[in-house]
């Protein structure tokens, strides 16, 4: 994908494997924006912090971290402590997400007012406003 000739103004969204492997193989390639997704566990937050540090060197635009499945204040505090100074979107654990999946529906269609969908609603503007 990194070798493709992609027209200016084209949005490409890629979902890469977990971890930092893809980021370490970028070489001198710059990307327009990076979203790092993490759970609020110690190991996952550590990897997210390392991924963000590497991604910062390769992005010419925003770097946003999505902390997924946040259950409580302890999770929120762990995210804030580990990722201090980063742009973070906290997405709460939300039964509407697996419910929509079981119904073979997008959460945005099935439960547009659910806490997780509302938390993610501002992500696009964080990515394209720069």
Predicted feature descriptions by range:
Residues 2-93, 99:
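Conserved catalytic-core segment of NTP-binding enzymes
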Residues 101-118:
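C-terminal boundary of histidine-terminating zinc-finger modules
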Residues 119-130:
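C-terminal alpha-helix
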